[in-house]
Amino acid sequence: MKRVKLIVAYDGTNYCGWQIQPNGITIEQVLNEQLSRFFKEDIRVTGASRTDAGVHSLGNVCIFDTDTRMPAEKISYAINQSLPEDIVVVDSCEVDREFHPRF
């Protein structure tokens, strides 16, 4: 299993923030759903920080673990094909399993 770091930019206008909420769609939710669908495994991203409803980001960092054999550097291009226009994965790379975006 490898750990992948994503740098994510988004226009938060239509979202209830980063963190999954019961009252509306969030950036984290969209990423989890699209990554899980793409890799056909349960993917849960962990973000460096949370943003509130309506807040934008040019480079929020998140990680996820996966069994995929796809090179991590190609994930950003591949996943952007299925993300809405207001969420873009700017970069993706493999990081050490000990890497955590908050610490």
What name fits each language-model region?
Residues 1-103:
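Structured-RNA-binding interfaces characteristic of tRNA pseudouridine synthases
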